[in-house]
Amino acid sequence: MARYIGPVGKVSRRLGIGITEKGLRILNKRSDPPGQHGAAARRRQLSDYGMQLREKQKAKFLYGVLERQFRRLFEQASRRSGVTGEYLLSLLERRLDNVVYRLGFATTRAQARQLVNHGHIVVDGRKTNIPSYTVKVGQVIAVRPQSRSRTYFKNLVDSGVLNKHRAPEWLRLNAAELSGTVVALPRREDAEAGINEQLIVEFYSR
């Protein structure tokens, strides 16, 4: 599936949120939107539609999901009983690439997506190379045994980086085994901060 590979700094400045660590560093240095009239653009009042669109774009870029798949996730969330926006965020959090990132096996979601694509991740012992796969409570996500001898994964364990990593409460990390278990569904506070999911619901409900 295609991915956005453009300048993360410009996107972070336009949306007002760091979509990656690099984007956050750039945003901290220069918060105005990109372009000749960046400061004026920040002062300009957004329409309701503009605010809704911006929130959708934030979520898409933060989680690395393109429009077609994002809309599919929204439609899935809207068919559920309960709060649509919160369930949408739960679906985004439970993407396999995001879980690999949350467990600390990767430093960015883009890197996590690459690890999944290259077949380094197993779910319940089965190789799963689909980043958009939705994990379920009780499933075990781990680095494939054949991949653990690779320098990257050995360094994760030997350096103690994983031992210091704090996974969210809905995931239980076993650093020594390079694995993690989904022990609960993610709550609203477990999702990325700075997203107003109600505006996303309003965008698709127009």
UniProtKB/Swiss-Prot annotation:
Q: Does the keyword RNA-binding apply?
A: yes
Signal sequence coordinates: none
Keywords, A to Z? Ribonucleoprotein, Ribosomal protein, RNA-binding, rRNA-binding
Q: Which InterPro entries match?
A: Ribosomal_uS4, Ribosomal_uS4_bac-type, Ribosomal_uS4_CS, Ribosomal_uS4_N, S4_RNA-bd, S4_RNA-bd_sf
A Pfam family name for this chain?
S4
According to the record's subunit comment, the protein's assembly and interactions are:
Part of the 30S ribosomal subunit. Contacts protein S5. The interaction surface between S4 and S5 is involved in control of translational fidelity.
Give the protein name, as stated in the record. Small ribosomal subunit protein uS4
